[in-house]
Amino acid sequence: MQIPQSYILTTKYLNRVFDKTVATYKYYWFLGILDLCVKHGKTRMNVWDIMITMVANAWYPVIYFRLSFGKSESLYEAIWALQKEYNIPINISIRDLTDLLHELVQKADVRKRLNFLQMNVPFRFLRPWIDTSDDRQTVVRSQSFENGCLYKLEKHEAVSYTHLRAHETELHL
């Protein structure tokens, strides 16, 4: 994948995010960040908000078109399980689904079902910028926005956040 050059965003590393991608998580993670930043003006995002946006954006392809993202894709199973367990309409709007998911993630079983999304994606997305497989090192090194990485990872009162670089609030791809 070749992303257009930018003086604001380090597209050299962003191109590498999507190399060797075997699951859709990184795509939906990035789309979630873009949605929250561009549509809602957020630069500091609760990881659960990004995950909710991921599920909402993948909902229609999975439920309506029955698109499977492959054998190693747990997002597909999580979406179907939520739809069946909570009888969520197939044609629900993204806005209504997002609102519903915000309510549902307050339930322990839903948080447990979706928790796999926050276990790796926030860290693996930053690997092209921060060359380490140690998640703790990724958190530490992201604090200085090493190599111009897109965001830093924070944890406050057991809640994880991403915080975009200050001048990255206008993402010019």
Where are these predicted regions, by residue range?
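N-terminal ordered "arm"
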Residues: 5-47
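Aromatic-enriched hydrophobic runs in primary sequence
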Residues: 7, 23-31, 38, 127, ...
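N-terminal accessory alpha/beta regions
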Residues: 41-150
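Acidic, proline/serine/threonine- and glycine-rich low-complexity intrinsically disordered segments
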Residues: 158-159
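Conserved small/polar residues in nucleotide/adenosyl-binding loops
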Residues: 162-169
